Amino acid sequence: MNRDNELVHEAWLNLKTGDRELARRYAERALLIVDDFETKVKAYYILSQATDNPKEKRDHLETVLAYDPAHAEARRELAILDGKLKPADIVNADSLPAQSTDPQQAKANRFTCPQCGARRVFAPDGKSLLCENCGYGDQFTVEGAANESDFFIAMATAKGHRKPVATQVFHCNGCGAEFVLAAGVISSTCAYCDSPHVVRLDESRDLLEPDGIIPHALTLKQAIEKLVSWVESHGIRPEKKVDQPRPVYLPIWTFDLGGSINYSGERIELDEPEGFGWNRKPRTMRFVRVNEQYPILVNDRAIPASKKNTAILNRLLPTFDMSAAKPYDTRYLANWPAEIYDITMSDASLEARVQVVRQYTDRMRLEITNVENMRLSSAGMTVESFKLVLLPVWLTEIQSNGELIHVLINGQNGRVV
């Protein structure tokens, strides 16, 4: 064991036994002679744990993250210092408490006309709620773009690992009826008075509320026109009457990823020939061991948040303009059914990492041509932030040639897959 590693080891032992002053001294001595990256990270983290001074602790934690942006413990401690994460909310993802399967009382927003009391629905102009009875409409605007949330903070709490399992009991403020919906539904109409309701997810402690939404921009008539045009252009002959497209908001996760992909292997180096004439030595080839990093930066990697229609939704995702996502507002869901996620954010983030590694692997093998036996590691990759976004989709099925074809229409621009 190197001298600096011995000092760090002693620092850890003293920190664990409660002698923080001695731990600090060992860590500081290690930093005086340290010559490798890993030991610096360990020493500075020990220093952050050996002090109660908030400024000193912050300085040490920020130094750790400057060396290693993916250092989970340092990010957690810094989030606690910043007040973004409460120690009581931190969970062990491997031993989460069981979720209740009992029906839960759900609070919901109800949209009625202030003039006649009839129900109001969101209009596909993306700007207004319209009364179905008297036509009264009022416009609303939601400024800005959908906000991103800190991935690490969500992962440290139960919200990053939860998915809905319990049913939801709605109490309709219109007629007083109570009715039950499955946990995967975020909006619906009252089964008795037909009044639209939208779940207030901020009341559901272990679920993440959507960060953004791309509003529906097509009417039913426009969706039918897009469907007919697509069927005709693909030469599809339906065997029976095709059901009208059904509108829905489908959830997706988007992730911003950074950091680096670490790669190792053997680089081929050629030595220049030496001497002249008969004494000239031929060029020789040798292999040099390399351990290097390839920087990555990925914005808005989209992953389905629902297990339904995942394969076909993956084909539809590239047709959306994600930059058009608005901050989530329950009024967008008035009379438009929506699903909440049943794929947790933690599971979706793993799929995002797999996709990014696959994407960069192809690029790296094309760009780094002088390294043999290349091996890759995603340990240096970090998921920086995420959004839960609701996408507008029209759904239907077509029976043709003995096959059931699932059709999805992009509710933003009419693209069909």
Residue ranges with predicted function:
Residues 113-116, 131-134, 172-175, 190-193:
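Short cysteine-rich clusters marking metal-coordination/redox-active sites
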Residues 2-29:
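Alpha-helical segment of the N-proximal tetratricopeptide repeat
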Residues 33-36, 50, 67:
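Structural marker of alpha-solenoid helical repeat scaffolds
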Residues 30, 63-64:
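Canonical positions in the second alpha-helix
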